[in-house]
Amino acid sequence: MEELQGYLEIDRSRQQHFLYPLLFQEYIYALAHDHGLNGSIFYEPMENLGYDNKSSSLIVKRLITRMHQQNHLIISVNDSNENGFVGRNKSFYSQMVSEGFAVIMEIPFSLRLVSSLEEKEIAKYHNLRSIHSIFPFFEDKLSHLNHVSDILIPHPIHLEILVQTLHCWIQDAPSLHLLRFFLHEYRNSNSLITPKKSISLLKKENQRFFLFLYNSHVYECESVLVFLRKQSSHLRSTSSGTFLERTHFYGKIEHLVVVLRNDFQKTLWLFKDPFMHYVRYQGKYILASKGTHLLMKKWKSHLVNFWQCHFYLWSRPDRIHINQLYNHSFYFLGYLSSVRLNTSVVGIQMLENSFLIDTSINKFETLVPIISLIGSVVKAKFCNVSGHPISKSVRADSSDSDIINRFGQIYRNLSHYHSGSSKKQTLYRIKYILRLSCARTLARKHKSTVRAFLKRLGSEFLEEFLTEEEQVLSLIFQRNSFPSYRSHRERIWYLDIIRINDLANHS
């Protein structure tokens, strides 16, 4: 218990007390209006956000002047219509302040991480928390495990829970009051961390603010798992304290012992199974084990009790299913993953005797659900609900090459993201939809037919829809030494998958 108490001890010297004045600095809004967080796999235009037209140094200065002239910035929501700051341009100015506020609130987290990097060696631990650790887990570990449980991170029942979570990190009272103001202004922010919603479905003009709140909530829910993983003999680490400094956390652990009517050290042995694995992507995580079904049930029970008693998070146990890997498929990272038992017969010749031996090998498979992928293409208006390609409206001054490049880049992005699929037939259907949608768009622009347009462009049009690996392999390998079908059956995981992807968020 002394080790746990020291492990969770708060470093008061790193708490940030003077964040609120940064709202009056122009460079904060310059950082906030960086469009990097708003990237989309379909390259949706940013004009609808209003940044390109309105976001300028003059408007930022005007905003700061209004905040200086205001007697009190933090006001009740009921009086917001009478206030000059959030009156006529309430939506736009509130958007600017909320995104600038998100940048400011990220500062304490960044400073603590940099400090930990300077003081400790966290290379191994950092890799464990990276999305890149998911790929080797799928390829090397999952096929050897027995049980899996895919769980949605529970969401808070009250907005004040989010404020209290950040209060453990930030002691700046005005910043916390401003946070309450924004949470009550955007009352629909509860959908931010509702399991059935994804971050990409949130209001785009407040995406950075919501992303910050979401990540803070995820770290809070994940904290107990990080600690238990550190205690495991298989995944020891010296840097978990970076993300585990929580007010009264030691008291919560003590209370957990009382609730479960068990000594904490006796309870901890349940989590020391070296075959228990944990991976997470956004709002969903997986617990997998080579152990028994009873071990998985104990993990489930402890996590549900811990979240409900100490984080006031409601998680329905009946929605946490424990399944055997060999007869269950789970949806994760945009793939429908499963472990299949492949049997084969091997013939052995020994002198005059011959034998036939049956061998069984667990094989990990990943499939791209065609319904989810087609649904995203329908949402982007490249085809109708039946999957038939349709033309898109384009600007009159757009050149043919720009239109073709845009359609080709969209397909390459989708193919790049889903290159880890065991079977590529779904991607061929998407290529057909995008290619024909592009042809219909160009034919509509030139007031021609699709057939005539394709005949005029010829093979140059088809080459725009080749993926990078298809182009490279066609140049490096001879057809007889590297059959084309082989490249379509091999899984390729790209480590630059860092953008938020709509297809990976829905089950």
Curated annotation (Swiss-Prot):
Gene Ontology molecular-function annotations: RNA binding
Keyword hit for Chloroplast: yes
The UniProt record lists the keyword Chloroplast: yes
Record keywords: Chloroplast, mRNA processing, Plastid, RNA-binding, tRNA processing
A GO cellular component entry from the record: chloroplast
Chief location: plastid
Record-given protein name: Maturase K
InterPro entries (UniProt xref): Domain_X, Maturase_MatK, Maturase_MatK_N
Role summary: Usually encoded in the trnK tRNA gene intron. Probably assists in splicing its own and other chloroplast group II introns.
UniProt record similarity statement: Belongs to the intron maturase 2 family. MatK subfamily.
Record localization: Plastid, Chloroplast
GO biological process: mRNA processing; RNA splicing; tRNA processing
